[in-house]
Amino acid sequence: MRPSRYAPLLCAMVLALAWLSAVAGCSRGGSSKAGRSSSVAGTLPAGVVGVSPAGVTTRVDAPAESTEEEYYQACHAARLWMDAQPGSGESLIEPYLAVVQASPSGVAGSWHIRWAALTPARQAAVIVAARAAANAECG
């Protein structure tokens, strides 16, 4: 069987298309750290946010995003609040998160940013810090 005279052209087109796909797949379209302070929270699809029967967000399936210092601040603020409450441990996580989420101006545990204005990654960081505070693991 004799190769078509268009075979080299077809091969070149396939290679060019493969190269473009690889370049597009490797392009950097991520956000910078400056974008982290956005005042608009991201929206997550249903099922990736855990909400208690009382309506408190207790889980956000996103990677927690905070610096070590921010984590410590959030954890310490949660711990101070928990120490002032009756009860201890895991039972205080949901009530604490309810306070954080209801605050019109944010609290120290959310870096003084309203819950609704935090990105899902920042909401996850607040929840991680609250869980650590309940277990006295702020560091």
UniProtKB/Swiss-Prot annotation:
One Pfam family per UniProt: LpqV
Signal peptide, first to last residue: 1-25
Subcellular location: Cell membrane
Disulfide bonds: none
Keyword hit for Membrane: yes
Magnesium keyword on record: no
Residues with lipidation of kind N-palmitoyl cysteine: C26
Lipidation (S-diacylglycerol cysteine): C26
Residue ranges that the Swiss-Prot or TrEMBL entry lists as coiled coil: none
InterPro entries: Uncharacterised_LpqV (IPR020377)
Keywords (A to Z) from UniProt: Cell membrane, Lipoprotein, Membrane, Palmitate, Signal
Domain of life: Bacteria
Gene Ontology CC, one term: plasma membrane
Membrane topology, record value: Lipid-anchor
Protein name as catalogued: Putative lipoprotein LpqV
Organism: Mycobacterium bovis (strain ATCC BAA-935 / AF2122/97)
Species classification: Bacteria, Bacillati, Actinomycetota, Actinomycetes, Mycobacteriales
